[in-house]
Amino acid sequence: MSWWWAGAIGAAKKRLEEDDAQPKHSSVALIVGVTGIIGNSLAEILPLADTPGGPWKVYGVARRTRPAWHEDNPINYVQCDISDPDDSQAKLSPLTDVTHVFYVTWANRSTEQENCEANSKMFRNVLDAVIPNCPNLKHISLQTGRKHYMGPFESYGKIESHDPPYTEDLPRLKYMNFYYDLEDIMLEEVEKKEGLTWSVHRPGNIFGFSPYSMMNLVGTLCVYAAICKHEGKVLRFTGCKAAWDGYSDCSDADLIAEHHIWAAVDPYAKNEAFNVSNGDVFKWKHFWKVLAEQFGVGCGEYEEGVDLKLQDLMKGKEPVWEEIVRENGLTPTKLKDVGIWWFGDVILGNECFLDSMNKSKEHGFLGFRNSKNAFISWIDKAKAYKIVP
């Protein structure tokens, strides 16, 4: 069974067991943001026996101590605050065998100006520690997203964005965007090392697993559904009519990880920016029923003339969540970490603008996901890791 499709159909993935003979590593990955929604998928896929470019040795960088739900991944965990240049140098510069950097993290601040400053500093700290100290460094893989074409969250509906479907050759918007800053920093830094290549990956709404992600839509909806179930309430739809009735798409976290790996090892994908999405479309009116069925809760409909927000419905629910965690023996979590209400409101409160996967296909990436199956599989994973009942 190829690694390429293992995530798509839920096949058992072959891992290198601790007592297996340790292979000579062909590639050494540095995943920056390893406990995030894409970092977690990369940490699962890179160590697989048949992952392209392998066998892979993997370093995973995150700010917090390693969580219990992440301990199964056979990686070298590096606790490091990349916003601190001294900590970045101390922790990352000794990793001299790194060949590939997968940068899949970000910091969320209150304004886009602050986002630009914070995220630029973090990215520079990593590259300043890695590029001069890793003689075999080959590739930097940077993840941004569809806001490249739409502008930052604070500008939604206030600025003129591109007409979808979005293609990678569209010009930058004339507005501040930390994605643009990160791309510029990367292009500047790769010039310092001959032969160093790069890729940029622009997913849409990500479906995946991580209790530590700041934009985990599936996890947020699972927590909302679990609270509705606990309180005996209907799962009301907290979004707009355009999201309920219109076409949406998503980007599966494992698919995005495969996309990163493909671009890192395939010569035809070097020095390019790519969209990455599942390749199909869905309507939230259908997925809402799926969500309700998975949690055994009554399914609501779009409510005309009612402005429903997750942030309002879930206000003050911390004691309820603590009770749910206690009664069901769940992994201890804080509601503010697993229920990202503002993000759910942004996604469900706006029309989804689609992208095009043609460039990825033309360069040789043919991966895809069935979004309904992916939605269910990520719900199942949240349950399996005891994040939700």
UniProtKB/Swiss-Prot annotation:
Superkingdom field: Eukaryota
Keyword line: NADP, Nucleotide-binding, Oxidoreductase
GO molecular function: Delta4-3-oxosteroid 5beta-reductase activity; nucleotide binding
Protein name: 3-oxo-Delta(4,5)-steroid 5-beta-reductase
Temperature dependence: Optimum temperature is 40 degrees Celsius.
EC number(s) from the headed UniProt entry: 1.3.1.3
Protein residues bound to NADP(+): T35, G36, I37, R63, R64, D81, I82, T105, Q143, Y179, I206, S213, M214, M215
Active-site residues from the entry: K147, Y179
The species this protein was found in: Digitalis lanata (Grecian foxglove)
Source organism phylogeny: Eukaryota, Viridiplantae, Streptophyta, Embryophyta, Tracheophyta
Entries under CDD domains matching the protein: 5beta-POR_like_SDR_a
UniProt pH dependence: Optimum pH is 7.8.
